């Protein structure tokens, strides 16, 4: 996987190209637009502790998941209930029945529909979904059913978009289906590396759907990413490593497949990282 540093190089190259284009009032001016204000910060979290830390840090919206080590799955009813009770910011619930690809069986689709109904009953403000066909296109029929079941909640299409066959056609399909935003890294390993594609998607969307960059977004690259792409929302985990307070640690027994990390440490959103992102976006 390319390093995040290469993403910063992509953004620097785009900004340099923009400056050259600006001398002749060329297309480069798109990349030098002032920072849109305000920029909404969405924190992707998979635990109550991460959700609380994100809210304290100033996140304006939560994507609530479980199991981010597998890219995220649907959170428990208990996690959603406690988040609803303790947070006063919108909560969008990930609807994903398992890790792996985004080609689902009829039984898995039934689970997704039921999870949407329960998220609505629990008071979620939005859901995050993604379904593909075997040929890599958006599964329009199933996405339409998910969107209809979710209404009147907000609907985001998640990073299944990043592994679809044709991003431009997929974006038009999602607009036609009434999806309100797309979470994407620009079909690259990280959003900074996919900044050029994200910028093109923003131009294609032309206000018809929100483009939400996510993947590898940090306090150090978020301002440049926003300037290079023209997005009005950003998505990040802001995670650091939490180490267990257990003093007794059994040896030779693993409960889950968590290699290479020990079961006595895990990722948790850090309040300070969210604060830095929020402050950076306010101050530019």
Give residue ranges: language-model regions.
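Active-site mouth loops of central-metabolism enzymes
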Residues: 36-46, 95-113, 132, 156-167
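Alpha-helix-loop-beta-strand connector modules within alpha/beta enzyme cores
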Residues: 72-99, 140-159, 195-218, 262-283
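Hydrophobic faces of well-ordered beta-strands that scaffold small-molecule active sites
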Residues: 39-43, 62-64, 91-95, 127-129, ...
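Glycine-enriched alpha-helix->loop->beta-strand junction motifs that scaffold or abut catalytic
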Residues: 57-62, 87-90, 123-126, 149-153, ...
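Glycine/small-residue-rich loop that forms an oxyanion/phosphate-binding "nest" at active or ligand-binding sites
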Residues: 78, 83-143
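Short terminal hydrophobic/aromatic SLiMs and anchors at protein ends
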Residues: 14-15, 23-24, 34
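Glycine-rich phosphate-binding active-site loops on the catalytic face of alpha/beta enzymes
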Residues: 63-72, 118, 122-134, 179-192, ...
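Catalytic cores of alpha/beta
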Residues: 49-53, 104-115, 165-177, 217-232, ...
């Amino acid at each position: 996987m390319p390093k995040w540093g290469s993403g910063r190089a992509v953004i620097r190259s785009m900004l340099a190209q923009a400056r050259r284009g600006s001398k002749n009032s060329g297309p480069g001016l798109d990349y030098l637009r002032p920072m849109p204000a305000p920029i909404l910060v969405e924190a992707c979290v998979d635990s109550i502790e991460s959700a609380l830390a994100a809210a304290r840090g100033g996140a304006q919206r939560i994507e609530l998941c479980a199991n981010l080590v597998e890219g995220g799955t649907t959170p428990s009813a208990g996690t959603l209930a406690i988040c609803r009770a303790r947070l006063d910011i919108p909560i969008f619930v990930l609807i994903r029945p398992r890790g792996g690809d985004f080609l689902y069986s009829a039984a898995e689709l039934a689970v997704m529909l039921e999870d949407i109904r329960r998220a609505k009953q629990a008071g979620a403000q939005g859901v995050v979904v993604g379904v593909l066909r075997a040929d890599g296109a958006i599964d329009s029929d199933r996405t339409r059913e998910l969107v209809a079941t979710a209404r009147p909640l907000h609907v985001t299409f998640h990073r299944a978009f990043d592994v679809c066959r044709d991003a431009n056609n997929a974006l038009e399909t999602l607009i036609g289906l009434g999806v309100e935003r797309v979470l994407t890294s620009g079909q690259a390993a990280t959003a900074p590396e996919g900044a050029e594609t994200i910028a093109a998607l923003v131009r294609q969307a032309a206000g018809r759907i929100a483009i939400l960059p996510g993947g590898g977004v940090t306090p150090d690259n978020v301002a440049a990413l926003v300037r290079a792409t023209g997005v009005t929302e950003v998505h990040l985990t802001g995670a650091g490593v939490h180490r267990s307070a257990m003093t007794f640690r059994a040896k030779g027994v693993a409960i889950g497949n968590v290699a290479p990390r020990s079961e006595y440490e895990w990722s948790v959103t850090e309040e300070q990282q969210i604060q830095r992102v929020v402050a950076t976006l306010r101050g530019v």
